[in-house]
Amino acid sequence: YSRCQLQGFNCVVRSYGLPTIPCCRGLTCRSYFPGSTYGRCQRF
């Protein structure tokens, strides 16, 4: 368990106040499809 999500791990684009683990440094959370709440941590 780490405090940040590694590349390829699931993430939440819009948390709406939910407890979430941010992507690690240098990664961004890209949604699976436009408007999706969930995505995957990827490099810029």
From Swiss-Prot:
Matching Gene3D superfamilies: 4.10.40.20
Protein name: Tachystatin-A1
Lineage, top ranks: Eukaryota, Metazoa, Ecdysozoa, Arthropoda, Chelicerata
Tissue: Granular hemocytes, small secretory granules.
Cell compartments where the protein resides: Secreted
Keywords: Antibiotic, Antimicrobial, Disulfide bond, Fungicide, Knottin, Secreted
Function: Exhibits stronger antimicrobial activity against the Gram-positive bacteria (S.aureus (IC(50) is 4.2 ug/ml)) and fungi (C.albicans (IC(50) is 3.0 ug/ml) and P.pastoris (IC(50) is 0.5 ug/ml)) than Gram-negative bacteria (E.coli (IC(50) is 25 ug/ml)). Binds to chitin (8.4 uM are required to obtain 50% of binding). Does not cause hemolysis on sheep erythrocytes. Has no blocking activity on the P-type calcium channel.
Site (May be important for binding to chitin): 9
Domain notes: The presence of a 'disulfide through disulfide knot' structurally defines this protein as a knottin.
Record bears the keyword Disulfide bond: yes
GO process annotations (BP): defense response to bacterium; defense response to fungus; killing of cells of another organism
